[in-house]
C-alpha cells in the first residue's frame, strides 16, 4: 500500500519536553496493520491510536481534533513525500502521554491534517513522529513488539561498533549505508515506509555507473500519497542490488524500486532483521542485527495494488526489461 509522509526537520518545529527531568523508561506496545506500526498514546487522558513514523512529524487529523475539542493555534509550511509544499494548521496537545503513564509530553506540537485516503483501514487519529522524541532515546524491538523510550542523560549501552552517526542537522535519523562495491548513499530510517529500501531516482542515477545494480523491470503507475494529495503517474524502475550494508550487517540479493522521495528510505522491514535504537540528542543510530549476513531474495509481483475509495485497484504495472 502506498504511504503518507510528512517530511521536515525536527529542529524547525518546537519540541515537546517530558514533564519531568529525572530518569525514566516508558514502554509503548505496537502492532502491525497493513505494514504500519500502530501504537496508542493518551491525548489529554484519552487513549487514541496513531501510526508510529520515524520519518514524519507528529500530526492529528481534523476529525480527531474535533472529537477531542483541540483547536488550531498557528500554521507552518510542510513538505510531503512528493516534495509538495503546503501550509498546515498547527496546535498544541496539552498532555500527550505514553500508555503506561510514565512520560507526559506537555504542550506537544502537532500538525493538523485532513483525513488521508487509504487510512480508513488503519483506524488511526494521526502520526507520532520523530519530533516528539527529540530529547530521548528510542529502542524498537520487533521480537517483543515494544518501543522503549528512555531519558538520555547517558548514551545507549549498545556497542559503538553497531552505531551510525546522523549525517544531517535537524534531528531526523538520516545515516549513510553502502551499496557494493563502493557506493555510499544517505538514507532516512522511516518506519512509515513498508519496504526494506526505497531508492530515490537521483541516488540511483548517481551510483548506477559504479554500483553493482541491475534494472530488472520498469513500471508505470500512480505516485505515492502525501498530505497534499497523490503524485502524478510516473515511471519507475525495479532494481536488483547484490549487496547492501547497514554498518557491519549485510543484506544480499535485494530487489527494490525507485521513487521520488526527498531521501532514499530505509523502511520498517529493517526491524525484521534486528533491533534499532535511536539516540536523538546525540544523533546516533544503532542497529543490532539478529544475523550478520542476510539473504533477502524478495519476490515481486507484476503489479502493485492500492486502496482507493474503499476499493482495491492496480496502481502500478511492471514489465520486464529483458
Language-model features: where?
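Bacterial Sec-dependent N-terminal signal peptides
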Residues: 1-26
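Pepsin/retropepsin-fold aspartyl endopeptidases
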Residues: 21-322
Amino acid at each position: 500500500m502506498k504511504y503518507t509522509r510528512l517530511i521536515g526537520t525536527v529542529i524547525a518545529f518546537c519540541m515537546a519536553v517530558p514533564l519531568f527531568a529525572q530518569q525514566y523508561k516508558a514502554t509503548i506496545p505496537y502492532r502491525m496493520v497493513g505494514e504500519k506500526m500502530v501504537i496508542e498514546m493518551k491525548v489529554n487522558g484519552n487513549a487514541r491510536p496513531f501510526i508510529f513514523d520515524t520519518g514524519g512529524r507528529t500530526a492529528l487529523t481534523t476529525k480527531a481534533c474535533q472529537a477531542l475539542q483541540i483547536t488550531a493555534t498557528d500554521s507552518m509550511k510542510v513538505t510531503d513525500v512528493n516534495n509538495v509544499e503546503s501550509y498546515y494548521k498547527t496546535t498544541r496537545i496539552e498532555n500527550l502521554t505514553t500508555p503506561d503513564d510514565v512520560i507526559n509530553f506537555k504542550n506537544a506540537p502537532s500538525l493538523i491534517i485532513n483525513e488521508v485516503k487509504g487510512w480508513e483501514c488503519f483506524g488511526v487519529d494521526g502520526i507520532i513522529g520523530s519530533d516528539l522524541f527529540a530529547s530521548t532515546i528510542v529502542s524498537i524491538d520487533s521480537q517483543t513488539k515494544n518501543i522503549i523510550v528512555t531519558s538520555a542523560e547517558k548514551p545507549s549501552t549498545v556497542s559503538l561498533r553497531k552505531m551510525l552517526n546522523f549525517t544531517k542537522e535537524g534531528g531526523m535519523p538520516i545515516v549513510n549505508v553502502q551499496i557494493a562495491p563502493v557506493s555510499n548513499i544517505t538514507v532516512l530510517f522511516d518506519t512509515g515506509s513498508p519496504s526494506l529500501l526505497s531508492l530515490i531516482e537521483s541516488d540511483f542515477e548517481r551510483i548506477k555507473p559504479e554500483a553493482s545494480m541491475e534494472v530488472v523491470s520498469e513500471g508505470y503507475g500512480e505516485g505515492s500519497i502525501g498530505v497534499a494529495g497523490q503524485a502524478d503517474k510516473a515511471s519507475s524502475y525495479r532494481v536488483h542490488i547484490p549487496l547492501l550494508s547497514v554498518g557491519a550487517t549485510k543484506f544480499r540479493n535485494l530487489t527494490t524500486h525507485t521513487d521520488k522521495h526527498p531521501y532514499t528510505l530505509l523502511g520498517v522491514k529493517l526491524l525484521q532483521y534486528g533491533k534499532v535504537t535511536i539516540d536523538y540528542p546525540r544523533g546516533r543510530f544503532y542497529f543490532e542485527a539478529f544475523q550478520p549476513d542476510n539473504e533477502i531474495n524478495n519476490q515481486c509481483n507484476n503489479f502493485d495494488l492500492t486502496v482507493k475509495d474503499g476499493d482495491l485497484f492496480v496502481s502500478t504495472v511492471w514489465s520486464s526489461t529483458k
